[in-house]
Amino acid sequence: MLLAGDVGGTNLRLALFEEEGGKLVERRRARFATREFATLHDAFDGFLAGERRLEAAAFGVAGPVRHGRAEGTNVAFSIDAAEIRADLGVPAVVMNDLEANGWGLAELTPSDFEVLNRGEADPLGNGALISAGTGLGEAILFREAGGFVPMPSEGGHASFAPRNDEEIELLKTLRLRHGHVSWERVVSGPGLSTLYRFERTLSGLPEPEWLTREVASAGDAAPVVSRAALAETDPVCQRTMHRFVSLFGAEAGNLALKALATGGVFVGGGIAPRNLPLVRDGFFSAFSAKGRFATLLARIPIKVVLNDSCAILGAARIAARAAARPARTEVTP
């Protein structure tokens, strides 16, 4: 049995898999709020109760990983492969969550994707993965024989680059608050809430009472804003989502240029699949608006990842590899 985990800033997912004929077969799964636990051990201790056939474990974590240890950017506890191995007595791997997602792409089927731009995939070209949720994750997908090999990064924390006068004002506002302003400050769930407050101030329009109530009830403006934008019930919410999608597309284009991702760009995370009508409307135009390289970017395929099990599947695949070489103490794929 293989233990796979996806540890994000909001949710912690665990699953048990078996490998049959080279294919991963899921046997059991659970999802928890990450904040419920002080350590990863607290989470998988109950989940694994009575399970005595474990062969290996692998976890994707939202944050940088060094020497098998992750200090999650939006996760309160650290995760160490050596500690997991000592605890469970099996090979253990800890990797960045975007790396896990990158490995998981090969486990998906065509129905797990929504095509934003069909383009012309270069069979020898690199790819790129960008994922917006609680944070903004980015990975480069190096092309090797047999598919992509993901290289994790923390590109979401690179400096935000405004494209027009309004976004310069946005940068000024956020710089007063945070000092350094990263792309994650504007392209993420918390970033969506930030953009909404900026757009509300910019518009000069008062917030409708019904919207104030819904935001207070939800405790988070982001899902309320996206729902109102989809329903076209508030113009400021619509402008907020338009800017969010445009910024998301712009940074995806930046990543595509850095990776020379002629093999395709994959858009992950929870925000894009839940807002597909809005993403279809403005993502590609911002993605390809790169001056002299607009033609190159226009030929790059773009797909939204619809399957939220991608990271778990990637972790399970790496766990299967670790189980096949048990003599090693696994800390990286």
Regions found by a protein language model. Name each.
Residues 1-53, 169-333:
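ATP-binding/phosphotransfer module of carbohydrate and carboxylate kinases, centering on a glycine-rich
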Residues 48-94, 99, 103-112, 129, ...:
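Short beta-strand-loop/turn "lid" adjacent to the catalytic site in phosphate-handling enzymes
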